[in-house]
């Protein structure tokens, strides 16, 4: 703070009390907000201490002897030497005299106009006119913290103020903010007190102790003006000064009034939070105290609901009342009135011996027929009981409290008592919020008779609903025999003699009448506060008076013992005859026996037995009606609970909720069986089983021991298997409490590393683990049976377990009617591949000892192999098991090898028939393979199958060759011969293989040339109307329809052997199987479900059937399907392709490279087609096709070593391990400022002021929302460190230019025990938002955007958490307890989600869409919620306004954009810049955001001043050489990659779906930041900068469309190189509008293009179904779902019923599951040409022309 001077005001002399600090005492970067309340208190203490040490005698003092006047008098003092203030420029007490004040004169003589002082501090000068702090005293900010708050003295201390003379008077600090005014006023008042002006300070009633003189008024005005500049005054202060600028006294009076109000609220909150009750005081007094506090807080705007109040009350209960905490903790809707009923019941039970009450406790959980309610008045509320019973047929019943018929009750009626002594009560104020006024309470000096009656007084009862009195001479207008039943707290009847009026004559000379009941059967005369409230009279226990609502005092309240009383002297007597009233028959009703008493007497039998016994007179002396059965149902006998304790019952079907709550493979049961003794060491002794709760799918794993690492290996395996094979994440695993499950290693692995909740069984409750226990029992039963049946040794016991598991997974459950495999989405078990356990077989010995040694070894089949397509077979002679397919079944009736009779072999027809199809399948493949072995080739055919399974081939055997033809009979013989040999089947099975297309045909084998051949390559079926042996000059070749790679590969279908003298080269088909011809289409579904884009068999020649012409197969059942599916494609943003002219093919042998030529991977991470076959009919591409326009001259951009952009896996890269560790330590990108950056050291003054304003706004909001407990500060040493959360202020500038400050918690270092990891913080999914926007455009919806300020602070926090105040506040050793969900906490998001979700459902009538969190809807409005942002969609704008009105009742809701205009409206929704014209179009972009963010990335933009036309280059590959850089440079580059790819990912997944392939591929190289990777990343950012103005364009759907159309377009790029996986991509469209896209690597390794395409489609189906459900929920129109792919072979597999196509274990399972999903979800599978497949941009880099062609229809 800079020093100030008043050189411009010469009239201000040495009498001025100005304060300042010189520039030498304050640092240059002093924080302007460092002057906090705590610092001001420190200053007060130091000032008071310093002043109290200096005293003078009256003789030496200039203070007059008049004790009622504290104004200083003139005194002769030496003139100042070097300034107006001697003694180190500090103003002494004697200098504040009229000699200095006379300069001011009368207030009318003020030498300058009011409040014209400059708002800035005065610059320092050589002759400063302000006092300085002496070094001995110190600055106000350097004094230690005071022990307690300061208080101001009242009039009683005025005399001492006069006599004490203080040498130094410390001036108050300068006011720097309107928010600091309350604290500043306290220091200013302290300044006045230290200046001997304490007598002029207003007291509680707003008046000073003595009058103020003109000189004092002038001094008061000038000092206030100097230290409180006008620009920092609150509005209410300015309003007072605008009327009278010298009325400082009014300002002080109002400030003191505000302080007193704040003090009362603070004291009430502290009192309520620290309630204690043990029954030592009457329950009525305790109830009155609590309810009065709650009433005051509610009237002051601090709402205390029933739930919070009950928790605070119960927390303070002790002794006999403590059990109420546990008996009522499940009652969610308990009220304060109900709780006090229980407290009263216990209290009265304790007083039973004195008041003759029954000696048993009333059950707190009993249902009550009465309730308490708060009267809805503006005055303090009075608690009353409802006088109505639940049964309206009975007469009215009133409830009275403190009822007693004790004979000790006094009956005298004395209207006068001795004068009560009052005892002052000093209100402790920890926060120094009041001025120290002392309040008094009228109490009777009697404390030892808490149960005695105060004679001549009425007891004030807040619990009584009626007034009762024993004396009759005060009752007016009495009537006998009233039809009123009165009961006490124990529901006992009180006889009533009469009813009348009770008339009061109060101090204000007014008469008031209330109803009264007469009864002599009570201990005290009760005055009901409820009836007083009905006549506008309330009891103020703060002032201890009865008063009206306008504040008129009627009568004093006397506290005697623990109760409050009102004198009877205010009652008016009546002339009624007492005998008239008392002559009423008062027969006491018969009292019933309490059930607990009878229960204990009859040996703790249950109520049903006792009741039945009494009804049948097996127990005499009393009847069933003599027992009070009201509490029998809910009564809990503690002795019975202890003595009869049993295990809880397991209800049948109790686990159904888990099956409904969890998805498949999310909830597992596991158990371990073992050990099995007397086994060889190689055999497992244990096994561990897993069972899925939903599907009942089982897994078993062998174990040799139960060590931690063994169990951990199994858990790692099963979790990885479920994640990769089923795309599921395990959430819960239930297990017993064995040490193998409860050890720290496994617990850490499950919870901390995988986020899995371990669910353990409770102690001695094995039945709770029934799923796993029953499975083990079943498997063991099967094991014993299998071993007995087969006669195999016991050490093969686990093989029997595994065989049983395979079978059990395939058997249907009687309940679900499905098997576990079907529930899991797997195909059924092919029993033809299964052998009986222990089936005798002969295994081929592939490595015999000699050539004459037998080639077969006897063995026993155990179970199918888990790791291959073979079978696990036990060989007794070798004492081992083998995994093989080279075996032959011994077909005999005997099942055991030791019983086998080789001389009596019989043919087992059943087994042969069962496995016939399987052996036929294997034999067919073996025949084909044997034929192919005779084909001569110049390359390795097997490698071609593995590396190029996608290339379409026409397998030509010698049967069709003129030089080497084979008769049909030869084939038949070979087939029979080969079928009996043990040739291993091929590893991969083509899904298109069946008996119809693999067995040789006589017709085909005898025909030398074929005129019409169809090939089922990756592109589907193509007609080849070309003779196979025609000369090349006349031959025509076909173009593969699958052009998904970066180059087009075309192949010749036939060669002329006569002219070329070359052997026919086979061309492989999809999947690596050799097809000699096209399979016959036998599936009727093929013609029904697929739209065939290839020509029919009788179609025209190929030149008239180009790829863009659609010629569907004409069948009687395909017309409607064709129309439906063509309508799906009609509105899609597909490119328009120009017609292509026929192409002449050159001589293939001139361009055909060697078959084994070097193969390269595709660019930018995609693995394209290998160039083993170059395009035979290829032509030179134009310059535009090859041009990329990315020709920046960089040394690293060379193509000498073209390799994949995939991370190198075959080489060890330097720093790879260090990279993984280093990335974890790299700090995230910080876009915000700290406090010191934004304020303390900020040199931009204007920005600094805006941040200061934002800071104060945030602090006020935190206080307004009651974020933390402001009543108590905690010491750090007393709190558990893990419950302490660091906090900080962060600052940032928003996109709209506003400056924002946010107080946040450091949730990144929050301890896991302080939050529930299972809670989820949900936000709206981007697909849900895009879907809602698309439907809004098609349906002319209004779109309204809202924002809820400080949303998280509306959610309460359940955990006990403390935060450290920000460091700049100087409270390093203190903590404050959180009450609200502060921003930054782990649980804040989940808490807010639950809060707003509950409000939207209950108050706004919304419901959340199942499966789509944060999407709410009703019949008119749809809401998308993203934290505190809300997007409302509705056809009627009034419906949106109605929701907004409801939200504003609870939350601070801002309307960002109402959306009512019919012109184009611009939105900024979750980062998307949207332009929307209702009923016409919608454009989505991020131009402004990218323009702001990209230049901050420090990327060299436009290196050659030209724009890029594509984001990447085809043919450019990353060098895989080792990366050798130092550690610091490595971290820096990784950090840079994170920033670049992070921004690109954000933009890509928002709307730039055309960039997702490049983003996904480069993201895999963040840990490999080579120069080449960085350059490619720069090019991507450069392309984003050049195209930052591009937008995703949507147009309104045609109004004639009857339904919604949801389409997924799929594509895949096959990865056919070792160590690399395929790339898959999907684009989703709703009514022709692109709403999302995905590009990623395949999670499974694919062995062919067809498998990659199937995997891509299968990945799109779940999201497609989810989107379909969302669309149907938001829009009730019918929906048509379509799947588009450019692979006809994939479509053929999906719609086929041929089970032979699903032999492959993984591929077959996925294909079968996909087929079921397509059929079950009514998906239309359509074919789309590759050149029109817009999903092609998601799987590979494309040339500029192709890239533009595929994207310019939907993004431009």
Curated annotation (Swiss-Prot):
<keyword id="KW-0862">Zinc</keyword>
<dbReference type="GO" id="GO:0004190">
    <property type="term" value="F:aspartic-type endopeptidase activity"/>
</dbReference>
<dbReference type="GO" id="GO:0032196">
    <property type="term" value="P:transposition"/>
</dbReference>
<feature type="domain" description="RNase H Ty1/copia-type">
    <location>
        <begin position="1611"/>
        <end position="1753"/>
    </location>
</feature>
<comment type="function">
    <text>Capsid protein (CA) is the structural component of the virus-like particle (VLP), forming the shell that encapsulates the retrotransposons dimeric RNA genome. The particles are assembled from trimer-clustered units and there are holes in the capsid shells that allow for the diffusion of macromolecules. CA also has nucleocapsid-like chaperone activity, promoting primer tRNA(i)-Met annealing to the multipartite primer-binding site (PBS), dimerization of Ty1 RNA and initiation of reverse transcription.</text>
</comment>
<feature type="site" description="Cleavage; by Ty1 protease">
    <location>
        <begin position="1218"/>
        <end position="1219"/>
    </location>
</feature>
<keyword id="KW-0695">RNA-directed DNA polymerase</keyword>
<feature type="site" description="Cleavage; by Ty1 protease">
    <location>
        <begin position="582"/>
        <end position="583"/>
    </location>
</feature>
<feature type="region of interest" description="Disordered">
    <location>
        <begin position="352"/>
        <end position="421"/>
    </location>
</feature>
<feature type="binding site">
    <location>
        <position position="1429"/>
    </location>
    <ligand>
        <name>Mg(2+) 2</name>
    </ligand>
</feature>
<dbReference type="InterPro" id="IPR001969">
    <property type="entry name" value="Aspartic_peptidase_AS"/>
</dbReference>
<keyword id="KW-0067">ATP-binding</keyword>
<dbReference type="GO" id="GO:0003964">
    <property type="term" value="F:RNA-directed DNA polymerase activity"/>
</dbReference>
<keyword id="KW-0255">Endonuclease</keyword>
<feature type="region of interest" description="Integrase-type zinc finger-like">
    <location>
        <begin position="583"/>
        <end position="640"/>
    </location>
</feature>
<keyword id="KW-0547">Nucleotide-binding</keyword>
<dbReference type="InterPro" id="IPR039537">
    <property type="entry name" value="Retrotran_Ty1/copia-like"/>
</dbReference>
<keyword id="KW-1188">Viral release from host cell</keyword>
<dbReference type="GO" id="GO:0006310">
    <property type="term" value="P:DNA recombination"/>
</dbReference>
<dbReference type="GO" id="GO:0005634">
    <property type="term" value="C:nucleus"/>
</dbReference>
<dbReference type="InterPro" id="IPR043502">
    <property type="entry name" value="DNA/RNA_pol_sf"/>
</dbReference>
<dbReference type="InterPro" id="IPR036397">
    <property type="entry name" value="RNaseH_sf"/>
</dbReference>
<keyword id="KW-0863">Zinc-finger</keyword>
<feature type="binding site">
    <location>
        <position position="1686"/>
    </location>
    <ligand>
        <name>Mg(2+) 3</name>
    </ligand>
</feature>
<feature type="compositionally biased region" description="Polar residues">
    <location>
        <begin position="1102"/>
        <end position="1112"/>
    </location>
</feature>
<feature type="domain" description="Reverse transcriptase Ty1/copia-type">
    <location>
        <begin position="1339"/>
        <end position="1477"/>
    </location>
</feature>
<keyword id="KW-0917">Virion maturation</keyword>
<keyword id="KW-0233">DNA recombination</keyword>
<dbReference type="GO" id="GO:0005524">
    <property type="term" value="F:ATP binding"/>
</dbReference>
<comment type="function">
    <text>The aspartyl protease (PR) mediates the proteolytic cleavages of the Gag and Gag-Pol polyproteins after assembly of the VLP.</text>
</comment>
<dbReference type="InterPro" id="IPR013103">
    <property type="entry name" value="RVT_2"/>
</dbReference>
<feature type="site" description="Cleavage; by Ty1 protease">
    <location>
        <begin position="401"/>
        <end position="402"/>
    </location>
</feature>
<feature type="compositionally biased region" description="Low complexity">
    <location>
        <begin position="402"/>
        <end position="418"/>
    </location>
</feature>
<keyword id="KW-0645">Protease</keyword>
<dbReference type="Pfam" id="PF01021">
    <property type="entry name" value="TYA"/>
</dbReference>
<dbReference type="Pfam" id="PF00665">
    <property type="entry name" value="rve"/>
</dbReference>
<keyword id="KW-0539">Nucleus</keyword>
<dbReference type="GO" id="GO:0075523">
    <property type="term" value="P:viral translational frameshifting"/>
</dbReference>
<keyword id="KW-0238">DNA-binding</keyword>
<keyword id="KW-0548">Nucleotidyltransferase</keyword>
<feature type="binding site">
    <location>
        <position position="1347"/>
    </location>
    <ligand>
        <name>Mg(2+) 2</name>
    </ligand>
</feature>
<keyword id="KW-0479">Metal-binding</keyword>
